[in-house]
Design a protein with these regions (language model features):
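N-terminal secretory signal peptides and thylakoid transit peptides that target proteins
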Residues: 1-14
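A cross-kingdom marker for long, charged
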Residues: 27-56, 60-109, 113-372
Length: 372
């Protein structure tokens, strides 16, 4: 286990480490329930149908070993800036795209599915807006032409790791501009972290869909929570009223970049404020299908809800202001950052089970033991 103390005293850190080891052992040792297995099998069946819809060349391009480094090398940048692996959504046939959406629906809740689908559709809007801007303002484009032309709903990529067959661990990845969605199945259980979601534009400002917002509640619920704090609580949680970080800190390859907890412990919130915190956590964790979400929420609770810390940087009275917040605990990292007006980034991670690593370790231990 990682030995960082998160700013705790040595005694408290030892106690927390013991509690975490116990919670992880309980989580890893709990057999998958029938609901877990049904959901995992539904995802497996959808993945199989997607693979069968591809031609031989695309099936080869989409398939990687489970241990391939590419499984953890997604990006949220435009494809022209960071090439992707797997198959391009725009290059596969209509039936394959439909099967891909079946797989995405099998892996997420209704809220998670619609967020991801709308992020992809919104990239079409962004591409159109940026190309129009470039046409009328060629001396100072906001983004390079190659990056702009690589935007759009067709420029997302999907990759499969391992084989989606019963009894074997496997995973799949959907990534592109403002999206990094990872799903891992091991032992009949599904892990849906890390999950990066971004939006640009956050809100449609013109046209027939003016007012439509992709990721509205992430910012609103965060603002509800910080606005509910009493002055003495705010002095601990609000680390600065100046503009916050313009991006998340725990993006791809940076899970361990946070060396300590910061801000206000959840145990110092009153019951109505704790309800707001739980609603905010649900807004992220429940993007996953219900079984994966419930298992993650249960792990967060067993690690100690009081261990969650809430911190805020930036103005606290304007949803359109450049603010940043974080929720951080032993089994959860949530970050929200306003990059620029009408442009946000979010990420959710499980420090102990990102990419299902804890469950995969247990699976291989059990497999090695049964082979003796």
């Amino acid at each position: 286990m990682n030995r960082r103390h998160f700013g705790l005293s040595a005694t408290a850190a030892v106690l927390l480490a013991q509690q975490l080891r116990q919670a992880l052992a309980q989580d890893a040792g709990r057999p998958a329930s029938s609901v877990d297995r049904d959901s995992a099998w539904r995802m497996r069946d959808a993945a199989t149908a997607f693979l069968e819809s591809l031609d031989a060349a695309a099936r080869k391009a989409v398939s990687f070993p489970l241990e391939a480094d590419q499984r953890t090398s997604w990006s949220n940048l435009p494809v022209a800036l960071v090439p992707r692996v797997g198959v391009n959504v725009g290059a596969i046939g209509l039936q394959s795209r439909r099967r891909l959406h079946d797989l995405l629906r099998a892996s997420t809740s209704s809220q998670g599915y619609h967020k991801i689908a709308e992020i992809m559709r919104h990239d079409d809007l962004l591409r159109t807006e940026e190309l129009e801007y470039l046409q009328h303002n060629p001396p100072r484009p906001r983004a390079g032409r190659n990056a702009i032309e690589s935007m759009g709903s067709a420029n997302y990529w999907v990759a499969m790791f391992g084989e989606p067959v019963r009894g074997k661990p496997w995973a799949w990845l959907l990534t592109g501009h403002h999206l990094g969605a990872t799903f891992t199945c091991a032992g009949g259980r599904v892990a849906a972290a890390p999950l990066f979601l971004g939006a640009q534009p956050l809100e449609d400002l013109t046209g027939p869909y003016a007012g439509f917002t992709v990721l509205s509640h992430e910012g609103l619920r965060g603002l509800d929570l910080v606005s509910s704090l009493h002055p003495e609580q705010a002095r601990v949680a609000v680390l600065s009223t100046e503009p916050g970080f313009s991006d998340v800190l725990t993006g791809v390859g940076r899970r361990d970049s946070l060396s300590r907890f910061e801000g206000l412990p959840a145990g110092d919130l009153d019951p109505p404020q704790q309800r707001l915190l739980h609603a905010l956590v649900d807004e992220y964790v429940r993007n996953a299908d219900f079984d994966a979400a419930e298992r993650h929420l249960d792990a967060i609770q067993r690690a100690g809800l009081d261990q969650l810390h809430f911190s805020w940087r930036g103005p606290t009275n304007d949803i359109r202001s450049p603010f940043y917040y974080r929720i951080h605990g032993p089994r959860l990292i949530i970050e929200f950052a306003v990059q620029e007006p009408n442009h946000i980034h979010t990420i959710m991670r499980d420090p102990q089970n990102d990419y299902g690593m804890d469950w995969l370790g247990l699976h291989y231990e059990e497999h090695a033991w049964s082979a003796r």
